[in-house]
Amino acid sequence: MGRDTIADILTSIRNADMDKKGTVRIASTNMAESVVKILLREGFIENVRKHRENNKYFLVSTLRHRRNRKGTYRNILKRISRPGLRIYSNYQRIPRILGGMGIVILSTSRGIMTDREARLEGIGGEVLCYIW
């Protein structure tokens, strides 16, 4: 059985958020780097750096904190398409999360991108996850 790297990323971020940790360590793969890059660009995480340990690479992500409190922002991360049930969407039927406040991460023929980028380019793909 294969591993679901997207679910591992989302679960580790969710667990670190619930445990009030400031950083998350994620195994580095091409898919993980693309998803974390989108999360960084959209402002769901503050900082990312690549760390090497015993010839293995890890992405160390810093979660975004509130200015006046010590806790992190509560992000809801939901896996949609999974290995047992793939969900695809064309660009006209890509769902809008909270009226555009959240993002949908898609795997397209041109790489991993957000719902806004996919609509602008007019391409659909596999709906990986929702984040709001």
Curated annotation (Swiss-Prot):
What's the short name of a Pfam family annotated to this entry? Ribosomal_S8
User: Would you tell me the Gene Ontology cellular component terms?
Assistant: chloroplast; ribonucleoprotein complex; ribosome
> From its record, what is one biological process in GO terms?
translation
Do the record's keywords include Iron-sulfur?
no
Write the record's keywords in alphabetical order, separated by commas.
Chloroplast, Plastid, Ribonucleoprotein, Ribosomal protein, RNA-binding, rRNA-binding
Q: How does it assemble?
A: Part of the 30S ribosomal subunit.
Protein purpose: One of the primary rRNA binding proteins, it binds directly to 16S rRNA central domain where it helps coordinate assembly of the platform of the 30S subunit.
Q: What is this protein called?
A: Small ribosomal subunit protein uS8c
Q: Give the species this sequence originates from.
A: Liriodendron tulipifera (Tuliptree)
- Please state the gene responsible for encoding this protein: rps8
